Amino acid sequence: MARNAEKAMTALARWRRMKEEEERGPIARRPHDVKDCRNLSDAERFRREIVRDASKKITAIQNPGLGEFKLRDLNDEVNRLIKLKHAWEQRIRELGGTDYRKYAQKELDAIGRETGNSRGYKYFGAAKDLPGVRELFEKSTEGEEQRRHRADLLRNIDAHYFGYLDDEDGRLIPLEKLIEEKNIERINKEFAEKQAQKQQTASDAAPENIYKVEEDDDDDLETQESTVIGEDGRPMTIRHVLLPTQQDIEEMLLEQKKQELMAKYLD
């Protein structure tokens, strides 16, 4: 009888679950791409599922007896779920929902200070004690100490360090004036030497008088003179330059052509 009653309760539970699913309607499955979800309520539900899965895995990773490989797998899975949760939170904000990033709890380190950057790969629970992971935390602690010391040094620096108050005692003004006078004298001397060199170069490269008229030698020109009586009754001598005729030009070209042919073939 007890067995039959147990079977009846199980069948009743299955029937009730089936009726609830029929009344609720089909449930959308979580898509791989958050852009495919266009319903705000579905996006909220998917985020809750991811948070629930991440919480379970973070609870499981606290057990150091799981072994190195299992802890590394769980830590990878938690990082993947956190990255996926951030993507769904961004999608919820795009659909007009709650901005979870704005109201999220701030992450604190072991001392209680707020961490500057929450991005990157993280280690949870017993995964922090894995081989090679502890050394990473020690290096990060050393870097934080160096940054803190540098911040302390910069905090104590005042205007005297940058030289803004050096002129208040009046010691630098006479020294600066003396150096300024020496520099001015040196610059004036260099300028005078350069000007003298430019003038010397300009005088050496000056061209001759371009307006000087040179007399032409007319001995090589064939001319003809004629005497005429001017208006005042005085005789004037007129020199005519004989221009070559067409025949003279042809003979000259022919002679030049002969010379070129003779030079070409005789050489």
Curated annotation (Swiss-Prot):
Instruction: Kindly state the tissue distribution recorded for this protein.
Output: Ubiquitously expressed.
Q: Which SUPFAM superfamilies match?
A: ISY1 domain-like
Which is one Gene Ontology cellular component term of this protein? post-spliceosomal complex
The reported result of mutating residue 180 to K is: In dma50; up-regulates expression of the transcription factor zip-10 and its downstream target asp-17
Keyword set for this entry? Coiled coil, Nucleus
| GO biological process entries | generation of catalytic spliceosome for second transesterification step; mRNA 3'-splice site recognition; regulation of primary miRNA processing
Upon deletion of the gene, what happens?
RNAi-mediated knockdown results in up-regulation of the transcription factor zip-10 and its downstream target asp-17.
Gene3D superfamilies (UniProt xref): Helix hairpin bin
Q: Which domain of life is it from?
A: Eukaryota
Question: What are the coiled-coil residue ranges?
Answer: 175-204
Predominant location: nucleus
Question: Where found in the cell?
Answer: Nucleus
Is Transcription regulation included in the keywords of this UniProt record?
Answer: no
Instruction: Provide the residue span(s) of the region labelled Disordered.
Output: 195-221
Report the sequence similarity comment from the record: Belongs to the ISY1 family.
What functional role does this protein have? Regulates the processing of the mir-60 microRNA (miRNA), which in turn negatively regulates the expression of the transcription factor zip-10. Does not affect the splicing of zip-10.
This protein is called Protein isy-1
Species this protein is from? Caenorhabditis elegans
Encoding gene, per UniProt annotation: isy-1
